């Protein structure tokens, strides 16, 4: 497979030709900024496909984190777009405090980021999943947190949304700064497709592990009524 792309960095025109016919790759979404943007144009982002890393406990140098997969009765997953990175969609996640029960931390993060309290715990993935920060992300986050993390080690939890959509509020519960600008229910494969490339292996693993629990209750109810 060959890919051609062109664009500008500052006032300079660039052209890129990439040939990936000899090995498999995954492409992230194309991102484009205006020429006047202080940030350089990102023409193409390519990530080699690799499985998520699973560990029994968080490795040294990785931030302890919880991830929340919130599924609706019709088998769709809650995702939201970050305020400052509008092209990036993700499931809720956040840091766990020292000594905090991880399931409680997941409930807390869900409430803080989405306002959701009507959620039923379904399952958790027993092992931790890790991902490394890309260099530019690592530098930015470590300046923000005043840390030196390599990446994040995540414990993932599955919850079923049992409330009404009016409950979802991206201002959260008021205890933390809002992180998301817009939200959507997505099919499992869409969640993976719209994830930022360095989180994608983790998302693939999470959805594979939770897939047996993804039941379309509305469809099952209709089928039962026909029997």
From Swiss-Prot:
| Outcome of gene disruption | No visible phenotype under normal growth conditions.
Organelle transit peptide residues: 1-44
Which Enzyme Commission number(s) are on file for it?
3.6.1.-
Q: Any idea where this protein resides?
A: Plastid, Chloroplast
**Boundaries of every Nudix hydrolase domain copy:** 61-208
Tell me the superkingdom of the source: Eukaryota
Give tissue specificity per the record. Answer: Expressed in roots, leaves, stems and inflorescences.
Presence of the UniProt keyword Nucleotide-binding in the record? no
Give the location of motif Nudix box in residue numbers: 94-115
A Pfam family reported for this protein in Swiss-Prot or TrEMBL: NUDIX
- Name listed for the protein in its UniProt record: Nudix hydrolase 27, chloroplastic
Q: Which GO terms describe its molecular function?
A: bis(5'-adenosyl)-pentaphosphatase activity; metal ion binding
């Amino acid at each position: 497979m060959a890919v051609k792309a062109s664009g500008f960095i500052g006032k300079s025109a660039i052209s890129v030709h990439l040939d990936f016919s000899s090995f498999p790759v995954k492409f992230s979404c194309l991102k484009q900024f205006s020429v006047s943007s202080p940030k350089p144009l990102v023409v193409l982002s390519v990530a080699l496909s690799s499985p998520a890393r699973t560990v029994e406990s968080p490795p040294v140098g990785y931030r302890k984190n919880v991830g929340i997969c919130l599924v609706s009765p019709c088998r769709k997953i809650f995702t939201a777009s970050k305020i400052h990175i509008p092209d990036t969609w993700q499931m809720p996640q956040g840091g766990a405090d020292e000594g905090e029960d991880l399931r409680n931390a997941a409930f807390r993060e869900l409430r803080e980021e989405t306002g959701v309290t009507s959620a039923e715990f379904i399952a958790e993935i027993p092992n931790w999943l890790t991902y490394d920060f890309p260099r530019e992300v690592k530098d930015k986050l470590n300046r923000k947190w005043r840390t030196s993390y390599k990446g994040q080690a995540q414990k993932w939890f599955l919850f079923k949304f049992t409330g009404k959509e009016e409950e979802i509020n991206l201002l959260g519960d008021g205890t933390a700064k809002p992180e998301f600008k817009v939200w959507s229910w997505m099919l499992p494969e869409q969640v993976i497709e719209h994830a930022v490339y360095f989180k994608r292996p983790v998302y693939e693993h999470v959805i594979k592990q939770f897939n047996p629990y993804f039941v379309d209750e509305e469809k099952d109810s209709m089928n039962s009524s026909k029997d």
